[in-house]
Curated annotation (Swiss-Prot):
CDD domains in the record: PTH (cd00462)
One protein family per Pfam: Pept_tRNA_hydro
Keyword Hydrolase: yes
Identification of the protein by name: Peptidyl-tRNA hydrolase
């Protein structure tokens, strides 16, 4: 049976639950809920974990409890515990440099300034792992763009208007993940990267 390891990036705790930076958590929680599976804390993996099957595939979902900037600690623990190849993991992460609702599936790449990805790259000593980036848009410019604006934006709560867009994104990504072992990866990459949030 094929096993897929999905790791959503975010910050634990109610304070950050609905923040833009927690899109990785929110998407995987939506996926897990669809299959009536609950997340359980596993200290050895430094994550909350959920598991379910779709056809002949076992999906293992992880929400690191390390906080975003130390996400690599959890990913390292997961990789070591399950003794898996890096091509079996897929990271779900927010991206402030992509327009709201835009999806980018990449097989490898730099952190792009994202501290969660930076931590993973440092722990794994490679950039060669798959990731799905979900756009949250840039912070509004007031008196010129500044660092504080960026922090406030990514840690700010998702608005109702944003949620209506992101719900479409979650559905699209989940639908593609469900087919990850029945369709060629290139097809799924193209499907996600061409997603248009404005289509009905």
């Amino acid at each position: 049976m094929n096993e897929i390891y999905l790791i959503g990036l975010g910050n634990p705790g109610k304070k950050y639950f609905n923040s833009r930076h927690n899109i990785g958590f929110l998407l995987l929680e939506s996926f897990s809920k669809k299959y009536n599976s609950n997340f359980l804390l596993k200290d050895k993996l430094k994550s909350s974990c959920s598991e379910f099957q779709i056809n002949n595939s076992t999906f293992k979902l992880f929400l690191p409890n390390t906080f975003m900037n130390n996400s690599g600690d959890a990913v390292r623990a997961i990789v070591d515990w399950y003794k898996i190849n890096l091509d079996q993991i897929l990271i779900i992460v927010d991206d402030k440099d992509l327009p709201l609702g835009k999806i980018r599936f990449r097989r490898k790449g730099s952190s792009g300034g994202h501290n969660g990805l930076k931590s993973i790259i440092e722990q794994l000593q490679t950039q060669n792992f798959k990731r799905i980036r979900i756009g949250i848009g840039s912070p509004p410019i007031t008196n010129g763009k500044n660092h504080f604006n960026t922090i406030s934006h990514v840690l700010g709560n998702i608005s109702l208007d944003e949620k209506s867009i992101l719900d479409k994104v979650y559905s699209r990504v989940i639908e593609s993940l469900e087919q990850i072992n029945t369709k060629k990866e290139e097809y799924i990459i193209n499907e996600l990267n061409s997603f248009d949030k404005d289509q009905p």
